[in-house]
Protein backbone atom coordinates (compact mmCIF):
# COMPACT_ATOMS: atom_id res chain seq x y z
CA UNK A 1 0.00 0.00 0.00
CA UNK A 2 1.49 3.32 -1.09
CA UNK A 3 0.72 6.43 0.92
CA UNK A 4 -1.75 8.61 -1.01
CA UNK A 5 -1.21 6.60 -4.17
CA UNK A 6 -2.32 3.10 -5.13
CA UNK A 7 -1.99 1.68 -8.64
CA UNK A 8 -3.80 -1.54 -9.43
CA UNK A 9 -3.48 -2.94 -12.95
CA UNK A 10 -6.13 -5.38 -14.14
CA UNK A 11 -4.44 -7.20 -17.01
CA UNK A 12 -7.31 -9.64 -17.53
CA UNK A 13 -9.68 -6.78 -18.31
CA UNK A 14 -6.97 -4.84 -20.15
CA UNK A 15 -7.78 -1.88 -17.94
CA UNK A 16 -5.71 0.24 -15.57
CA UNK A 17 -7.32 1.25 -12.31
CA UNK A 18 -5.66 4.24 -10.65
CA UNK A 19 -6.62 5.15 -7.11
CA UNK A 20 -5.33 8.62 -6.20
CA UNK A 21 -6.52 10.22 -2.96
CA UNK A 22 -9.82 8.31 -3.01
CA UNK A 23 -10.26 9.25 -6.66
CA UNK A 24 -11.10 6.62 -9.27
CA UNK A 25 -9.76 6.80 -12.79
CA UNK A 26 -10.32 4.15 -15.42
CA UNK A 27 -7.85 4.04 -18.29
CA UNK A 28 -8.05 1.65 -21.21
CA UNK A 29 -4.44 0.96 -22.16
CA UNK A 30 -5.24 -1.56 -24.88
CA UNK A 31 -3.39 -0.36 -28.02
CA UNK A 32 -4.50 -1.43 -31.49
CA UNK A 33 -8.03 -2.31 -30.38
CA UNK A 34 -11.19 -1.40 -32.27
CA UNK A 35 -13.00 -0.70 -29.00
CA UNK A 36 -12.83 3.06 -29.52
CA UNK A 37 -16.10 4.68 -28.49
Curated annotation (Swiss-Prot):
GO CC terms of this entry: cytosol
Keyword tRNA-binding present in the record's keywords: the answer is no
Q: Where does the record say this protein resides? A: Cytoplasm, Cytosol
* Name of the protein in question: Albumin-2
**Where, by tissue, is this protein expressed?**
Expressed in seeds (at protein level).
Q: Which UniProt keywords apply?
A: Cytoplasm, Seed storage protein, Storage protein
What subunit structure does UniProt give?
Answer: Dimer.
What is this protein's function per UniProt? Binds hemin and thiamine.
Q: What else is known?
A: On the 2D-gel the determined pI of this protein is: 5.7, its MW is: 26 kDa.
Which Cys-Cys disulphide bridges does the record give? none
Q: Where are the Hemopexin repeats?
A: 6-37
GO molecular function of the protein, one example?
Answer: nutrient reservoir activity
